[in-house]
Amino acid sequence: MAQRWSIGEDFIIAKFCQEQQYLDICDNLLDELINRLRQKGFSSRSKSAISKRARDFTDLFRGWGSEHTAKQVKQVYGLLSGEGYNNHLKELKAFITERQQAYMGGKLDFLNSPADQKIHMIHRAQGRKFVDVLEDYIKNSGIKPRSRMYCDVGMSEDTFSAIRRGKYKTVSRENLFKICFGLRLKYDDAVILMKSCGCALQDSNVLDCVVEYFLRKGPTVDCVYKDKGKEKICYIYDTFQIDADLIESGVPELFWGFRKGDDKDDEEDDQ
């Protein structure tokens, strides 16, 4: 019987590609991984034998890079879904660990790359207010903020102002998710930044646990649909496509947000 991939195992590969979504290096890393597996005697399955699940998996990365990158991810998935599954997975884990240690240890030259910027951003966060760091993130990431940042992250103006004044030393998972959504910032990176600024996560309530569940399941998947004539987009941290009916019936409002660039809507709100 074919080996079934669990969410956790999908996440290992997805996390690898998501961490390296800086596409100037992603292509080379995937090439290196494919070559390493082949040198160890792992042969890729034929194209026809690569499962539909592998094809679905690569679709997650089409928005991040070239068709070339998507094909490489499919090759990796094909290598890992054949005989000797556990050995393949072990090899992939070792590869990821080795490369991540090299990144964090500064052994690779990523001058002016997003990876380098992220590390410096975290270092600069020490002893600063969380909101100040987020504003730096906006400026350095090329994201076009809306007319008011607190709207961009989905918080009330009072809550945002209180955070800016340093009133809160804790941040709820719900608000942290809204920050991630508004700024397109990865959840784990937001946690690192928050802790670097001396903030902590609040004790979990039921909603926080639901949010945490989604946040920990995998990379973002965009679900776009029409609502009252406006195009909405849903960011769900999951490795599976979510049916639109399921979203509309059960996902909390905090998951919704309008597409970036809807400045006309903001202008109308301001009037």
Give the positions of each predicted feature.
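A short, Lys/Arg-rich alpha-helix, primarily the initiator
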Residues: 107-146, 223-231, 235-254
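Short, basic-rich loop-to-helix N-cap that marks the start of a DNA-contacting helix
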Residues: 167-182
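Recognition helix of helix-turn-helix/homeodomain-like DNA-binding domains
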Residues: 19, 56, 154-171, 195-198
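Short, Lys/Arg-enriched anionic-surface-contact patches
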Residues: 1-16, 118-130, 155-158
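Intrinsically disordered, charged low-complexity linkers and terminal tails
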Residues: 1-109, 113-115, 267-270
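Short, charged recognition helix plus adjacent turn
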Residues: 92-107, 191-219
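Helix-turn-helix DNA-binding helix
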Residues: 46-50, 160, 190
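Short, charged amphipathic recognition helices of the HTH superfamily
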Residues: 20-39, 47, 140-148, 172-176, ...
